[in-house]
Structures are given as C-alpha cells and as structure tokens.
C-alpha cells in the first residue's frame, strides 16, 4: 500500500491518518499504524533521581522522601521518621528547633528525654 495519507495536526501534534485495513494487518506497521524505523536507537534506561537529605547530608536514590522542618519532601526516610517522632513527643516548633541544632553534627537519631537548653555533644 503506497497511497499518500493526509496528516492531521491537533493541539500542535501531527498525526497520520491510517486506513483501518492497515491497522488490521499483521507486522510492524499494524502495531502503531506507521512503519518502524530499524535504525532507531534503543531507549536509554531510566535512572533514579539522586537527592541529598537536608538533615544528614546522605546522598541516596531512595523512593521514600519525607516531610521535614522546611515542609517539602527534603528528608531521607530515617531522618523523616525521626522528625515525625520528635513532633509527636515535643510538638512541631520544638522538633524544628532541635533538628536545626543537630543538623550536620552526626548526632544519632535518638529521641531525647527532654529538649531543654542546648544540645550536648
């Protein structure tokens, strides 16, 4: 079938009108309505998004990122769970202050008994 088919433009995208017979035939043309290009390169594999934790600075390609003191998903899973536990125990304002105090110090993620004064290292 070597008939010229009209091209329809819709919303800035060009589509080729294909007869129904062509879609019913078997082969590479039948699957997409257009002939396959044998010279096309295979698709590149997707790579994960690399993020840095706003608290501990850990670089991970994790699927789970949690809300932190700054709001958006800026904490790794471990720091996010720690922050949530601080909120439950001391409230959001105190938890936010504590997270700012221990940021980047290498302090273990252990819930303190109380949040008075400054953090001891």
UniProtKB/Swiss-Prot annotation:
<dbReference type="InterPro" id="IPR000679">
    <property type="entry name" value="Znf_GATA"/>
</dbReference>
<feature type="region of interest" description="Disordered">
    <location>
        <begin position="29"/>
        <end position="48"/>
    </location>
</feature>
<dbReference type="GO" id="GO:0006357">
    <property type="term" value="P:regulation of transcription by RNA polymerase II"/>
</dbReference>
<dbReference type="Pfam" id="PF00320">
    <property type="entry name" value="GATA"/>
</dbReference>
<dbReference type="GO" id="GO:0008270">
    <property type="term" value="F:zinc ion binding"/>
</dbReference>
<keyword id="KW-0862">Zinc</keyword>
<protein>
    <recommendedName>
        <fullName>Protein GAT4</fullName>
    </recommendedName>
</protein>
<dbReference type="InterPro" id="IPR013088">
    <property type="entry name" value="Znf_NHR/GATA"/>
</dbReference>
<keyword id="KW-0238">DNA-binding</keyword>
<dbReference type="GO" id="GO:0034224">
    <property type="term" value="P:cellular response to zinc ion starvation"/>
</dbReference>
<keyword id="KW-0479">Metal-binding</keyword>
<keyword id="KW-0863">Zinc-finger</keyword>
<dbReference type="InterPro" id="IPR051140">
    <property type="entry name" value="GATA_TF"/>
</dbReference>
<dbReference type="GO" id="GO:0043565">
    <property type="term" value="F:sequence-specific DNA binding"/>
</dbReference>
<dbReference type="GO" id="GO:0005634">
    <property type="term" value="C:nucleus"/>
</dbReference>
<dbReference type="GO" id="GO:0045944">
    <property type="term" value="P:positive regulation of transcription by RNA polymerase II"/>
</dbReference>
<feature type="zinc finger region" description="GATA-type">
    <location>
        <begin position="53"/>
        <end position="79"/>
    </location>
</feature>
């Amino acid at each position: 079938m070597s008939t010229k088919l009209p091209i329809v433009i819709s919303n800035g995208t060009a589509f080729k009108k294909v007869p129904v017979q062509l879609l019913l035939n078997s082969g590479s043309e039948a699957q997409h309505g257009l002939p396959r290009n044998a010279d096309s390169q295979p698709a590149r594999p997707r790579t994960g998004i690399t993020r840095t934790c706003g608290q501990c600075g850990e670089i991970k390609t994790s699927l789970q990122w949690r809300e932190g003191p700054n709001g958006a998903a800026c904490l790794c899973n471990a720091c996010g769970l720690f922050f949530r536990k601080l909120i439950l125990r001391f409230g959001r304002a105190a938890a936010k202050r504590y997270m700012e105090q221990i940021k980047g110090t290498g302090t273990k993620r252990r819930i303190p008994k109380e949040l008075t004064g400054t953090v001891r290292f």
